[in-house]
């Protein structure tokens, strides 16, 4: 079974491309990372930074998560991210996404030993 840390890697990490100017990026990646299997995941963010840099966020600025938990952390610096949002015409199983390139601070929830990101909370 996939651990929470592994799920975070699958759903949110893309170290291979620093920036993809490809408007088709989300359509391809959401399928490739199994986020369109039983439904279209409505919103998802990919982070284009090294695994080490993203794991390091767990020791940066402690903030409160959207759900009220206190194990969220905001990155000190901005990161290259891609936002994938389902389009109005998207209908399972033909999930369709709009791709947006952004440079923002990320907020992740961390847990475990080693203390690693397990949930992508927001970008600011």
From Swiss-Prot:
UniProt keywords, alphabetically: Disulfide bond, Endonuclease, Glycoprotein, Hydrolase, Lyase, Nuclease, Secreted
Glycosylated position list: 34
Keyword Magnesium: no
Signal sequence annotation: none
A GO molecular-function descriptor: lyase activity
Tissue: Pancreas.
Protein name: Ribonuclease pancreatic
Organism of this sequence: Hippopotamus amphibius (Hippopotamus)
Lineage of source species: Eukaryota, Metazoa, Chordata, Craniata, Vertebrata
